[in-house]
Amino acid sequence: MKLFYSPGACALSPHIVLLEAGLPFTIEKTDLRTKKTETGSDYYAVNSKGTVPALQLDDGRVLTEGPAIVQYLADQKPDSGLAPRAGTFERYQLMEILNYITSEVHKGYSPLFNPKISADWKASALANLGKKLDWLSGFLGGGKAFLMGTTFTVADAYLYTVLRWSEHVGIDLEKWPVLTAYRSRVGQRPKVQEALKAEGLAK
């Protein structure tokens, strides 16, 4: 398998999952501005959406969209604990939190990366995102180590990836001590550190 990524972008999530699952894979860096991969290939030929992540299987098929990719990877190693078994209620709970991260939290960060955003729009976007972070803080409160309880899952890889963007867009995550502790806890995992180093995000 080959994972197409851009350092620090949302492809970090499946990168972490690949390592946590112990699956064989390679990575190929992609420039999202030029839509060229580090080997000089046209990235649109891999993913016509032009976004990362994209996972190219050994048979040439390509899967895109982070939540779909991480569940596919978890299902390749069902005993890893990275996702509840398909068809169980717990699996639908995992899908619920993945959907929340992608449609509310990830989406909430996106406009803040726009350098042309107006002051009023930025203030509104920050306020809206703050409400999502409030909910996550409450959801993780009460001593939960991870989103699904005591077990690290693909949802944690995704939320960790998104929370890493906070300082880059002017969000002081210290306002949410539960989320700060959570991000630190996930970030200390050996495979998370390995992914960060591979993408040039840590020494």
Question: Model-derived features: where do they sit?
Answer:
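GST-like domain detector, emphasizing the conserved glutathione-binding G-site
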Residues: 1-123, 127
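Short beta-strand(s) of the beta-wing in winged-helix/HTH DNA-binding folds
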Residues: 53-56, 147, 193
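Short, flexible loop/turn segments with low-complexity composition
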Residues: 85-86, 194-201
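GST-like fold's C-terminal all-alpha helical module
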Residues: 73, 89, 97-190
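Conserved beta-strand edge residues that scaffold enzyme active sites
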Residues: 32-33, 180, 200
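Carbohydrate-binding/catalytic loop surfaces
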Residues: 119, 201-203
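Generic structural signal for helix capping and beta-alpha/helix-loop junctions
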Residues: 35-37, 183, 203
